[in-house]
């Protein structure tokens, strides 16, 4: 440690220090650079042969041949060229990069039904990523479903998904059958003869109670519908039987479940 300090002090007082440093730099610039392999040889390290990867590099420097390309522009290696040890030629990528559109959509929002002093409000969120035409088609579909409620009861429809879309079918309600004493208040022959069931709108139909304490239920189409147009708007048609039209009216007025419990419909 003392010797190093003495050297530093001596160099500070050495008047020709800059000249000596310049001479050293000049000598260093003129010195031949040697590879690590040559330095090992000078130090006496025994090296019999160069590794194969050095030999392959030397060959590539001395003999550079152009790459052979086939008609498709794919690189074909020269079979006579010496292969580097440990390297395995794998298949080259022979496909072109393709641009793939990636769309990140937001989370789907369920329909929201809210009620306030002004009534009920149903909010449907538009699906993400629709074009202008697809948006118009989606809105038209929702509008068509809403308007179809004029002609049938959507709550009574079956819902089935298919490859083409959705299939909704009217569910036929089968009335309960009970052993009761029939009351002949209508003439079957007359019902079958009419071409439009609405012609029997003023004709009453009677349903017997399930309990003796109740009075029979007597009702007509006029009591259930204000007009033939209203009857048609909820799914009625002239080919219905008188009883089917009455049951449709009970469902429309939301009286069917109450009547089914108390009377033999």
Swiss-Prot record:
The modification Phosphoserine is found at residues 60, 64, 226-227, 233. Residues 58-70 have a biased composition (Acidic residues). Residues 245-265 are annotated as: Interaction with the Nucleoprotein-RNA and template-binding. Phosphorylated in the N-terminus by host CK2. Phosphorylation of the phosphoprotein is required for the transcriptional function of the P-L complex. The modification Phosphothreonine is found at residue 62. Signal peptide: none annotated. Residues 171-193 are annotated as: Hinge. Nonenzymatic cofactor regulating the function and conformation of the RNA polymerase and part of the transcription and replication complex. Binds the viral ribonucleocapsid and positions the L polymerase on the template. Acts as a chaperone for newly synthesized free N protein, so-called N(0). Plays a role in virion assembly. This is Phosphoprotein.
């Amino acid at each position: 440690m003392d010797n190093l300090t003495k050297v530093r002090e001596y160099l500070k007082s050495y008047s020709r220090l800059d000249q000596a440093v310049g001479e050293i730099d000049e000598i260093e610039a003129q010195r031949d650079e040697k590879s690590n392999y040559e330095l090992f040889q000078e130090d006496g390290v025994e090296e019999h042969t160069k590794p194969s990867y050095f030999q392959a590099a030397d060959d590539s420097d001395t003999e550079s041949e152009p790459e052979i390309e086939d008609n498709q522009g794919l690189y074909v290696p020269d079979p006579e060229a010496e292969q580097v040890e440990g390297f395995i030629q794998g298949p080259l990528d022979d496909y072109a990069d393709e641009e793939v559109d990636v769309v990140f959509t937001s989370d789907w929002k369920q329909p929201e039904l809210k009620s306030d002093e002004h009534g009920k409000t149903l909010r449907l969120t538009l699906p993400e990523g629709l074009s202008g035409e697809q948006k118009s088609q989606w809105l038209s579909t929702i509008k068509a479903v809403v308007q179809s409620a004029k002609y049938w009861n959507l709550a009574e429809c079956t819902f089935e998904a298919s490859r083409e879309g959705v299939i909704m079918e009217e569910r036929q309600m089968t009335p309960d059958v009970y052993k009761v004493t029939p009351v002949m208040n209508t003439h079957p022959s007359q019902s079958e003869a009419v071409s439009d069931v609405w012609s029997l709108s003023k004709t009453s139909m009677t349903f017997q109670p399930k309990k003796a304490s109740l009075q029979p239920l007597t009702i007509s189409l006029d009591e259930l519908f204000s007009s033939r147009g209203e009857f048609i708007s909820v799914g009625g048609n002239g080919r219905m039987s008188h009883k089917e039209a009455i049951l449709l009216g009970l469902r429309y007025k939301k009286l069917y479940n109450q009547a089914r419990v108390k009377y033999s419909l």
